[in-house]
């Protein structure tokens, strides 16, 4: 029998550990959290490659078994509740039933990767191989249609294949670029209701990624989940079209925005405020040294539509809104804020103008920085464990002051990062 005093201490410690969501709500309200809030794996842009997930399970002494690949496009591994607890993760992510290839994440079956790891992939994950031995994946797992993405035999994730058909502007229709922006069904709503109810008792913050709000996310433009995508689907063609076919692009965004708000209304009707954040868009506006467009172009082509979605969310829910954009986007930060985004990710600290001290000083009381904790293109990938620890602590000191910060690396943790650097990062977080 456990003595009452010890039992009380256990209960008290357990209660204190259940403060993830409360701590999260502090930091996104720009109040100083009790500790740094941590996310690994809650979104498709804050995830961990399946190879590293397997190493983490081994590091923490968890059951040895194949890891589920919850997003095959980037080969992101599932961060299950065992790892959430082991890594002191504060945020849980929810995504739709289908992955980016239009394949339901269910009926998991074992596959062996090019690098020799046994993983679990959805049952309808049907692939073929080209003459070089590269892996080809087909939309919805249908091998009777052309493949939509390829993983080189020396690679660790998929790249979209260019399926752009010749464009005749005289017959180009807005509907051609709306095929993937369908209204949610009762099946979809029941799925979301069930998933949200499953995690209500976990005392974790929740970010939902329902899809359908992307507005030009270049990762989604090729539509790797559609069997025969129509319209403008080439990456280069899309970027050019924002200038040469501006009226067409704006009409696409206008229609997408109306569909998105209709879907968000229906989603809110079944899950209410049981989530904390909604992932809106992953459209990248930055390169390593500059932006893809001027502030004037952003204000004209994107801002009105983002603002319409964000305004509906803020006027009708308690959700915060999440915007991902890689690159040197400091010159667009005020416009992201004007558009109503509450959160910016991944905070690419090695890009031009993205000095964390500057960002925190100029924008830290108006937008939450979700990321920027370790430079995945620099120290995290190529430095020593000591350098990684030093960088993590420095970034947290800067970005976590007065809240407004959720720790994550600059984008996903890749397969070939030295694992000792992953351990160093986790160790630094423990020492804060």
Over which residues does each language-model region extend?
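Residue-level detector of functionally special positions within alpha-helical transmembrane segments
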Residues: 19, 88, 115-116
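Short, glycine/charge-rich beta-strand/loop segments that flank catalytic centers
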Residues: 93-109, 211-215
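Short, charge-rich binding segments
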Residues: 82-86, 118, 127-128, 197-202
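Active-site loop segments of alpha/beta catalytic cores
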Residues: 6-58, 62-69, 151, 155-432
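A contiguous, low-structure linker/loop signature
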Residues: 100-171
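Compositionally biased, low-complexity intrinsically disordered regions
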Residues: 1-5
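Catalytic domains of carbohydrate-active enzymes, especially glycoside hydrolases
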Residues: 76-95
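Outer-membrane beta-barrel proteins
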Residues: 69-76
């Amino acid at each position: 029998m456990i003595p009452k005093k010890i039992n009380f201490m256990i209960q008290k410690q357990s209660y204190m550990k259940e403060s993830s969501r409360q701590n999260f709500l502090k930091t996104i309200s720009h109040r100083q959290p009790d500790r740094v809030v941590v996310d690994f794996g809650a979104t498709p842009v804050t995830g961990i490659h399946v190879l590293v997930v397997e190493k983490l399970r081994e590091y923490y002494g968890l059951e040895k078994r194949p890891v589920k690949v919850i997003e095959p496009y980037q080969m992101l591994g599932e961060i299950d509740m065992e790892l959430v607890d082991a890594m002191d993760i504060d945020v849980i992510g929810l995504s739709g039933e289908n992955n980016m290839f239009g394949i339901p994440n269910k009926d998991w079956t074992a596959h062996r990767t090019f690098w020799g790891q046994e993983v679990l992939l959805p049952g309808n994950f049907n692939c073929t191989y080209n003459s070089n031995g590269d892996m080809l994946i087909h939309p919805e797992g249908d091998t009777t249609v052309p493949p939509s993405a390829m993983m080189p035999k020396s690679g660790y994730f998929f790249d979209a294949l260019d399926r752009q058909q010749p464009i005749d502007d005289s017959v180009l229709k807005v509907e051609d670029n709306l095929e993937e922006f369908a209204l949610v069904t009762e099946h979809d709503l029941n799925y979301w209701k069930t998933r949200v109810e499953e995690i209500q008792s976990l005392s974790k913050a929740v970010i939902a990624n329902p899809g359908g709000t992307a507005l030009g996310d270049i990762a989604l433009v090729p539509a790797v989940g559609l069997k025969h995508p129509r319209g403008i689907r080439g990456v280069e063609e899309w970027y050019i079209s924002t200038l040469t076919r501006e009226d067409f692009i704006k009409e696409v965004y206008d229609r997408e925005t109306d569909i998105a708000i209709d879907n968000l209304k229906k989603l809110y009707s079944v899950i209410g405020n049981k989530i904390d954040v909604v992932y809106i868009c992953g459209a990248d506006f930055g390169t390593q040294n500059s932006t893809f467009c001027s502030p004037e172009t952003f204000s004209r082509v994107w801002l009105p539509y983002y603002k319409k979605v964000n305004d509906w969310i803020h006027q009708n829910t308690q959700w915060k809104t999440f915007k991902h954009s890689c690159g040197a986007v400091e010159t667009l930060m005020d416009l992201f804020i004007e558009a109503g985004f509450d959160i910016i990710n991944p905070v690419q600290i090695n890009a031009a103008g993205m000095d964390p001290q500057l960002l925190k000083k100029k924008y830290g009381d108006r937008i939450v920085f979700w990321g920027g904790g370790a430079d995945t293109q620099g120290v995290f990938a190529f430095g020593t464990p000591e350098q990684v620890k030093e960088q993590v602590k420095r970034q947290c000191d800067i970005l976590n002051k007065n809240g407004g910060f959720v720790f994550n690396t600059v984008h996903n943790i890749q397969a070939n990062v030295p694992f000792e650097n992953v351990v160093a990062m986790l160790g630094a977080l423990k020492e804060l």
